[in-house]
Amino acid sequence: MRGLRPALSTFIFLLLITGGVYPLLTTALGQWWFPWQANGSLIREGDTVRGSALIGQNFTDNGYFHGRPSATAEMPYNPQASGGSNLAVSNPELDKLIAARVAALRAANPNASTSVPVELVTASASGLDNNITPQAAAWQIPRVAKARNLSVEQLTQLIAKYSQQPLVKYIGQPVVNIVELNLALDKLDE
């Protein structure tokens, strides 16, 4: 019975710290230092939320740049089902899936002259990635230009405008946020 009081005191103390103080403190600091990120990095147009800068969307129309495939198959880019496909590189099912994606991209982009960029046929670890390389976006320019009656130069400039450089020059690569890029495309039509 003597050991019960210290154990119960420790339990209550840790419950208050880990279940109350720590979550409230990290939430408050997040809201104070990083309010946009802490609230989901929402992209707004007026009062309308158009998406998140952190989660991709399923753009399938020829007039939009396509992002990485989603690993959340039933509902693409479903954040509640986040996760990779868990197919090993040696799995024949992954080979079939990638071959089907390459064939679909080749059919949708018949004027593309180079091989299909790898990030357009492979899902990210989260299955929700919204970024592709500027090269993968540029690969899609002929299709988007034709569908929207825009020049290659206009789309090249738009990709350059929405390209983000890595925080550390030699770690990572430049990326383009597909959601922001496609919203900018819609604004060109206005």
UniProtKB/Swiss-Prot annotation:
Alphabetical UniProt keywords: ATP-binding, Cell inner membrane, Cell membrane, Ion transport, Membrane, Nucleotide-binding, Potassium, Potassium transport, Transmembrane, Transmembrane helix, Transport
Cellular compartment(s): Cell inner membrane
InterPro entries found in the cross-reference section: KdpC
GO CC annotations on file: plasma membrane
Keyword presence, Ion transport: yes
Top-level taxonomic group: Bacteria
Keyword Membrane listed: yes
Membrane-crossing segments per the record: 10-30
Subunit and partners: The system is composed of three essential subunits: KdpA, KdpB and KdpC.
NCBIfam families (UniProt xref): kdpC, PRK00315.1
Homology family: Belongs to the KdpC family.
Function: Part of the high-affinity ATP-driven potassium transport (or Kdp) system, which catalyzes the hydrolysis of ATP coupled with the electrogenic transport of potassium into the cytoplasm. This subunit acts as a catalytic chaperone that increases the ATP-binding affinity of the ATP-hydrolyzing subunit KdpB by the formation of a transient KdpB/KdpC/ATP ternary complex.
Name the record gives this protein: Potassium-transporting ATPase KdpC subunit
Lineage: Bacteria, Pseudomonadati, Pseudomonadota, Gammaproteobacteria, Enterobacterales
Gene it is expressed from: kdpC
